[in-house]
């Protein structure tokens, strides 16, 4: 059955599932960490950041988009660790700006959320470099913008955007001169 809209309860569950997924992939993400410093802590920092937000999100008994927005934004900012955590918190901040005044989200809304997330994160980084988490987020936002009018099922939309993010991730080493 196609899901054409998601409400705050559904988004809360999706966010918590995503947080748990990042936590379960922490070591894999640590291995991806090669720039700016190959210190192997990107997964750890992203996990600490998102789990801080997840704690606040999980505490919401009757979530609305506004309360989710606040919990995700403030929780991720308070829990942000390292460059990757700060960037992740800014991606969430931009995304949450778009959802705060909504009742439900469609693929059109999600595409706008991804665009705002990327714009906010790029502005937060003094010298953004391609071949990083920013590149992956930007690619995902571009794919969302490309397909949102054709793909209305949120699950299919999410799969396509995530699959494209993985393609961009695989290509990122080609974009960093220090890795060539």
Task: Please tell me what each predicted stretch does.
Residues 1-180:
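N-terminal loops that bind phosphate or other acidic moieties
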């Amino acid at each position: 059955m196609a899901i054409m809209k998601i409400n705050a309860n559904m988004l809360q569950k999706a966010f918590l599932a995503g947080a748990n997924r990042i936590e379960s992939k922490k070591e894999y993400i640590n291995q991806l960490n090669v720039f700016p410093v190959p210190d192997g802590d990107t997964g750890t920092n992203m996990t600490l950041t998102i789990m801080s937000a997840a704690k606040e999100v999980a505490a919401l008994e009757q979530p609305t988009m506004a309360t989710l927005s606040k919990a995700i934004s403030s929780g991720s900012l308070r829990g942000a660790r390292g460059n990757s955590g700060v960037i992740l918190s800014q991606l969430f901040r931009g995304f949450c700006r778009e959802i705060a005044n909504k009742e439900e989200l469609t693929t059109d809304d999600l595409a706008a959320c991804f665009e705002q997330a990327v714009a906010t994160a790029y502005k937060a980084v003094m010298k953004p470099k391609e071949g990083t988490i920013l590149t992956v987020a930007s690619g995902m936002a571009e794919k969302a913008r490309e397909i949102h009018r054709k793909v209305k099922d949120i699950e299919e939309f999410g799969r396509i955007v995530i699959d494209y993010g993985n393609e961009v991730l695989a290509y990122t080493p080609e974009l960093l001169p220090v890795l060539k």
